[in-house]
Regions:
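Conserved kinase catalytic-core helix
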Residues: 1-33, 38
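Activation segment
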Residues: 34, 44, 61-63
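Short loop/turn and capping residues at structural boundaries
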Residues: 36-37, 41, 110
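Conserved protein kinase catalytic/activation segment
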Residues: 39-54
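C-lobe/activation-segment region of protein kinase-like
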Residues: 50-119
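Conserved NTP-binding catalytic cores of kinases and kinase-like/nucleotidyltransferase enzymes
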Residues: 121-145
Length: 145
């Protein structure tokens, strides 16, 4: 059992299940407004697995299937950008592989993976720059105008 209370098998099964659920969500035309780990509630089901619930859905939208769009890619960046102590790079790759399913090794998905890595690194750098420039104490100072 790891620091998060899950065995390696449980963690891998949970990542597989979450990837499948996110894929189904996207296949149905939904794009979450803020799909970050803190907006995913995980609860143990009656068996071995976990059930996942997406929270903070005020900006979640469903788009018609005939409308070509790539907004779902933003959800992958949102999920990937937060460093999580118990989620390794290999875990992230397992998630991506399961998300892509049988089409994992296609050229389009290899391009998507490179795009995702670039976007994630850029977004993390932007967030780190904000954190470095602005301390909590400074944020709390009232700015008179």
């Amino acid at each position: 059992s790891g620091a998060d209370g899950f065995s390696i098998r449980e963690k891998r099964n949970a990542l597989r299940s979450l990837a499948q659920q996110v894929r189904r969500f996207h296949d149905l035309g939904f794009v979450h407004g803020d799909l970050v780990p803190s907006n995913i509630l995980a609860c143990r089901d009656n068996g071995d697995g976990l059930l996942f619930y997406f929270m903070d859905n005020d900006r979640t939208r469903r788009y018609p299937s005939w409308l070509p769009q790539g907004l779902w890619k933003r959800n992958l960046v949102q999920l990937n950008r937060m460093p999580l102590a118990s989620i390794s790079l290999q875990d992230r790759m397992r998630f991506f592989r399961e998300y892509c399913g049988a089409k994992y090794s296609t050229a389009a998905n290899r391009r998507l993976l490179l795009w995702l890595e670039t976007k994630t690194r850029r977004r993390r750098a932007e967030c780190d720059a904000i954190d470095a420039e602005m301390s909590f104490r400074r944020l709390m100072i009232w700015q008179e105008r």
